């Protein structure tokens, strides 16, 4: 296959994932503005932002069926139209109800982007190159986490959040049109699939002891990381570290860059460590443990530069993504797709729960001048750290449920 076709596939579908990542974190910049304009509480803000993740989660199984039946080109282009409609609904709303509908539509609309990118890559790239290609796809998506930091903050100095919403909708339609027009048509699928079978497969995975052994630590750390990165890290920087809004926005971008480096770096290092006798399961566990350690250091307010702490938070925050590779080692090939889809589903449900929960806990304190007391944030972070430590115990305990699957040559 010509390299130009492969590059076209990569950039088109990576652009789709970039769009989904921007939508994931855009409320970081919007939050103080919509809170002021519409009088939202922290609980309202947490629920509103988390609807992206619940929309993403509930769409996973139907999206998997659509991808198998129609292929990534048509499904991605069509679903992104819903995302554009969602952000326009969001930007035009003058009450919490309209904002919630818009945010839910966005989550549903972009729910296909990452899975479609992985599927399109699998159709056009050699298997040996997929880990690297998928890592770069994650990195391009991570640029969205950079954009919602300083660039978005600067843009909001000269325009309104409603105008930015209109622009995001237009950009989303441009990406959708590019995928529809320029992605290869010959890779569209026509496999028969049904939602009932997918639900049965998901339920089978959820009853698996091996799944929960592998997923226990990663779903909690990933849930915490993305819940904080997409909303609550900025208030922490402002209220606890006493940073200026501009400094906080810059550190959000630092976190995004660090996460990109972490995803690519840990993905590349994992197989090298495995050749040295360190399993991907153990390597992933060490990375997640370091992520928890960074959170402890932040809560204790150790005298380190904020940029150093946020960079470490980003680098180690994404290491749980290695659990997808671990799943492939312990589930037979015909179950890997369902195992990874189920893992994504659980992670996004937890992100939803954590975002709502953080907002609910913060709302027990009365904000002063738009800021919550430091003790409120420390309480939230301490609870989240405790949950991660509890899940880590299950992850490291000896188990008889993990047995690597032997792959037979085909």
Question: At which residue positions do the language-model features occur?
Answer:
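Helix-breaking motifs and short loop linkers at transmembrane-helix boundaries and internal kinks
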Residues: 39, 71, 92-98, 126, ...
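Extracytoplasmic gate region of multi-pass secondary transporters
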Residues: 27-28, 209-266, 328, 351-359
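Extracytoplasmic
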Residues: 8-42, 58, 228-234, 354-359
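Helix-loop-helix hairpin linking two adjacent transmembrane segments in secondary transporters
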Residues: 136-185
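Conserved MFS/SLC helix-loop-helix module at the cytosolic interface between two early adjacent transmembrane helices
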Residues: 58-97
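Cytoplasmic helix-loop-helix junction between adjacent transmembrane helices
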Residues: 102-140
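Helix-to-loop junctions at the C-terminal end of transmembrane segments
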Residues: 59-71, 263-278, 362
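Juxtamembrane intracellular "pre-TM" segments in multi-pass secondary transporters
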Residues: 1-2, 185-215
């Amino acid at each position: 296959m010509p390299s130009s076709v492969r590059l076209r596939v990569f950039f088109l579908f990576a652009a789709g994932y970039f769009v989904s990542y921007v939508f994931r974190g855009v409320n970081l910049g919007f939050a103080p503005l919509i809170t002021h304009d519409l009088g939202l509480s922290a609980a309202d803000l947490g629920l509103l932002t988390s609807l992206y993740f619940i929309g993403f989660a509930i769409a996973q199984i139907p999206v998997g069926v659509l991808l198998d039946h129609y292929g990534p080109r048509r499904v991605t282009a069509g679903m992104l139209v819903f995302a554009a409609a969602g952000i326009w609904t969001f930007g035009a709303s003058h009450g919490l109800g309209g904002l919630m509908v818009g945010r839910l539509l966005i989550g549903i609309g972009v729910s296909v982007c990452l899975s479609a990118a992985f599927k399109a890559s699998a159709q056009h790239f050699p298997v040996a190159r997929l880990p690297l290609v998928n890592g770069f796809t994650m990195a391009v998506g991570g640029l969205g986490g950079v954009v919602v930091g300083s660039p978005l903050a600067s843009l909001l100095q000269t325009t309104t959040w409603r105008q930015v919403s209109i622009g995001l909708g237009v950009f989303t339609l441009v990406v959708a049109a590019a995928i529809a027009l320029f992605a290869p048509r010959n890779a569209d699928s026509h496999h028969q699939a049904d939602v009932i079978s997918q639900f049965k497969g998901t339920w089978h995975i959820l009853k698996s002891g091996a799944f929960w052994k592998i997923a226990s630590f990663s779903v909690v750390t990933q849930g915490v990381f993305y819940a904080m990165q997409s909303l609550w890290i900025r208030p922490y920087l402002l209220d606890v570290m006493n940073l200026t809004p501009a400094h906080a926005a810059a550190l959000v971008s630092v976190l995004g860059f660090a996460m990109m480096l972490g995803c690519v770096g840990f993905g590349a290092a994992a197989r090298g460590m495995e050749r040295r006798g360190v399993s991907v399961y153990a390597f992933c566990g060490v990375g997640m443990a370091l992520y928890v350690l960074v959170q402890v250091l932040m809560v204790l307010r150790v005298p380190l530069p904020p940029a150093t702490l946020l960079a470490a938070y980003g680098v180690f925050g994404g290491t749980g993504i290695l659990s997808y590779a671990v799943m492939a080692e312990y589930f037979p090939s015909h179950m890997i797709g369902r195992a990874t889809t189920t893992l994504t589903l659980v992670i996004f449900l937890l992100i939803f729960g954590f975002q709502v929960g953080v907002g609910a806990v913060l709302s027990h304190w009365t904000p002063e001048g738009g800021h919550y007391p430091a003790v409120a944030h420390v309480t939230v972070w301490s609870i989240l750290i405790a949950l991660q430590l509890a899940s880590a115990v299950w992850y490291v305990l000896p188990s008889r449920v993990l047995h690597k699957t032997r792959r037979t040559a085909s």
